[in-house]
Amino acid sequence: MTQDELKKAVGWAALQYVQPGTIVGVGTGSTAAHFIDALGTMKGQIEGAVSSSDASTEKLKSLGITVFDLNEVDRLGIYVDGADEINGHMQMIKGGGAALTREKIIASVADKFICIADASKQVDILGNFPLPVEVIPMARSAVARQLVKLGGRPEYRQGVVTDNGNVILDVHGLEILDAIALENAINAIPGVVTVGLFANRGADVALIGTADGVKTIVK
């Protein structure tokens, strides 16, 4: 199976967690896009979705799925999203698609975070994938200096502006042994909106696409 076929398999597998009559939290990226396609087959059974990016909102609406502002929603049963890396503790690096802040907000509200990923995203130690940090534009250089002190090598993601109007620094060279401590440390830097470490709020369920089928891991 190709990588895209593995992503499609886990996207469709996540449908089993969607309860009729509910509002579903939806992530961003190539794997989440397959979940949105799958969700389109249930559009008459769900109330709608909360979206983590303008791109996902556009796709949801194109399939006839109602998109709610998070402020209108009291609770979310599930949030379904991909990951750039996921470790054995169900901690993740996310933000390759620059939607990390909205993703983290929606994940924090949801009762259950379901991570959908192909097997190439599974790692023992996080950090080989550059760690994205969303930053207020005026603080870019100041934040970069602090990230160097934490042992990283930040690179400005040229030409990318987030849906929130901010910029992204991708931090290379990190071997993340204590993901919760690093998430807290980076989030404490003035000018950081959030870091793409999902450690304090990791995944509850991981659906991993493998050549032998979809593997389910429960926290």
UniProtKB/Swiss-Prot annotation:
<comment type="function">
    <text>Catalyzes the reversible conversion of ribose-5-phosphate to ribulose 5-phosphate.</text>
</comment>
<keyword id="KW-0413">Isomerase</keyword>
<feature type="active site" description="Proton acceptor">
    <location>
        <position position="103"/>
    </location>
</feature>
<dbReference type="GO" id="GO:0006014">
    <property type="term" value="P:D-ribose metabolic process"/>
</dbReference>
<dbReference type="GO" id="GO:0009052">
    <property type="term" value="P:pentose-phosphate shunt, non-oxidative branch"/>
</dbReference>
<protein>
    <recommendedName>
        <fullName>Ribose-5-phosphate isomerase A</fullName>
        <ecNumber>5.3.1.6</ecNumber>
    </recommendedName>
</protein>
<dbReference type="InterPro" id="IPR004788">
    <property type="entry name" value="Ribose5P_isomerase_type_A"/>
</dbReference>
<dbReference type="InterPro" id="IPR020672">
    <property type="entry name" value="Ribose5P_isomerase_typA_subgr"/>
</dbReference>
<feature type="binding site">
    <location>
        <begin position="28"/>
        <end position="31"/>
    </location>
    <ligand>
        <name>substrate</name>
    </ligand>
</feature>
<comment type="subunit">
    <text>Homodimer.</text>
</comment>
<comment type="pathway">
    <text>Carbohydrate degradation; pentose phosphate pathway; D-ribose 5-phosphate from D-ribulose 5-phosphate (non-oxidative stage): step 1/1.</text>
</comment>
<feature type="binding site">
    <location>
        <begin position="94"/>
        <end position="97"/>
    </location>
    <ligand>
        <name>substrate</name>
    </ligand>
</feature>
<comment type="similarity">
    <text>Belongs to the ribose 5-phosphate isomerase family.</text>
</comment>
<dbReference type="GO" id="GO:0004751">
    <property type="term" value="F:ribose-5-phosphate isomerase activity"/>
</dbReference>
<feature type="binding site">
    <location>
        <begin position="81"/>
        <end position="84"/>
    </location>
    <ligand>
        <name>substrate</name>
    </ligand>
</feature>
<feature type="binding site">
    <location>
        <position position="121"/>
    </location>
    <ligand>
        <name>substrate</name>
    </ligand>
</feature>
<dbReference type="GO" id="GO:0005829">
    <property type="term" value="C:cytosol"/>
</dbReference>
<dbReference type="Pfam" id="PF06026">
    <property type="entry name" value="Rib_5-P_isom_A"/>
</dbReference>
<dbReference type="InterPro" id="IPR037171">
    <property type="entry name" value="NagB/RpiA_transferase-like"/>
</dbReference>
